[in-house]
């Protein structure tokens, strides 16, 4: 069935890849934006513009009412006030859900694979629920999804790994800028801890498939690579920036990485076996290391890859 899909974050890194994926599959897109540049970008892509932002809950409710389904990717990436922006995401999901209850219209929200409560050393799976008291406040998004599901909303969760291309790579974007600022590319301990990854076009394709076949309460993992060692990531960044690669102890991690220390030393492998089986999704894009090797580290126009450490909003 062809749908009119309301996409939040439609001009963001992932949203801007989802939009053409939906259009090419025959869906119509209603895209949320707050800026004139966003309006021009969406109109050029053949998208109907819906003005608003994450603080305007009424505009979000109106966008959802006007649509057959919702993909929510927008998030304020300000890690200096991470708890606050995660609480905002909870309110956004609750607002979207409030007008979808009982309608059977799908709502696909976004979370991260690191939220899963997996046993140490074992890749997180779609069956792993989030910890009740998770140390990462982004768990609020999945808690909000569970809350609206209990009220009759057909809601599912897309858990993202480090989503990448040759310009942007999730948290690794910030690690690159940190290495640029400090003159060294670092990892914690022996660097054997792992982060999962997926190319942005593979992730976009999965969002579309998940929305089309969404099951209430389902969790989907957009994982192409189960775990890339942080030492490997640090080494390719070091080569790209032409800076030394060093190990920092767990005790030194906070001083070196700042807010990124909450993630830098964690082993977060994740599997997408159930997602691939359920949605016949097969990732085909380049791997994380390949994209890091191909990016231009010294191009002033490389864009968000060198955004300020504290904030990168979309």
What are these regions (language model features)?
Residues 139, 164-174, 181, 209-220, ...:
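Glycine/proline-rich active-site loop of Rossmann-fold NAD(P)-dependent oxidoreductases
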Residues 52, 261-314:
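C-terminal amphipathic/interface module of NAD(P)-dependent oxidoreductases
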Residues 3-25:
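N-terminal Rossmann NAD(P)H-binding glycine-rich loop of SDR-like oxidoreductase domains
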Residues 28-30, 76, 90-135:
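Conserved Rossmann-fold NAD(P)-dependent oxidoreductase catalytic core, especially the SDR/UDP-sugar
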Residues 2-4, 206-260, 300-314:
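Mid/C-terminal beta-alpha module of Rossmann-like enzyme folds, strongest
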Residues 16, 31-94:
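NAD(P)H-binding glycine-rich loop region in Rossmannoid oxidoreductase-like domains
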Residues 130-157:
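Active-site Tyr-X1-5-Lys
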Residues 151, 161-194:
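NAD(P)-dependent short-chain dehydrogenase/reductase
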């Amino acid at each position: 069935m062809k749908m009119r899909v309301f996409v939040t974050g439609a001009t963001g890194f992932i949203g801007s890849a989802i939009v053409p994926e939906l259009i090419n599959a025959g869906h119509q897109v209603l895209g949320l934006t707050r800026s004139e540049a966003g309006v021009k970008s969406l109109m050029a892509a053949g998208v109907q513009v819906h003005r608003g932002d994450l603080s305007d809950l009424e505009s979000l409710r109106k966008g959802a009412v006007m649509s057959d389904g919702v993909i929510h990717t927008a998030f304020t990436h300000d890690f200096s006030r991470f708890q606050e922006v995660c609480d905002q995401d909870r309110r956004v999901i609750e607002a979207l859900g409030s007008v979808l209850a009982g309608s059977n219209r799908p709502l696909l929200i976004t979370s991260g694979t690191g939220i899963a409560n997996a046993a140490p050393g074992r890749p997180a799976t779609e069956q792993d629920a989030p910890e009740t008291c998770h140390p990462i406040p982004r768990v609020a998004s999945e808690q909000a999804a569970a809350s609206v599901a209990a009220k009759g909303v057909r809601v599912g969760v897309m858990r993202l790994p480090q989503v990448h291309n040759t310009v942007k790579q999730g948290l690794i974007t910030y690690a690159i800028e940190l290495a640029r600022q400090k003159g060294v590319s670092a990892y914690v301990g022996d660097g054997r801890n792992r982060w999962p990854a997926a190319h942005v076009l593979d992730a976009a394709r999965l969002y579309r498939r998940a929305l089309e076949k969404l099951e209430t309460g389902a969790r989907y993992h957009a994982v192409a690579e189960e775990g890339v060692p942080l030492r490997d990531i640090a080494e390719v960044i070091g080569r790209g920036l032409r800076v030394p690669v060093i190990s920092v102890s767990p005790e030194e991690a906070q001083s070196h990485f700042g807010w990124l220390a909450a993630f830098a030393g964690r082993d977060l492998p994740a599997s997408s076996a159930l997602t691939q089986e359920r949605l016949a999704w097969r990732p085909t894009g380049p791997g994380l290391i390949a994209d890091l090797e191909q990016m231009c580290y010294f191009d002033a126009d490389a864009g968000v890859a060198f955004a300020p450490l504290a904030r990168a909003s979309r």
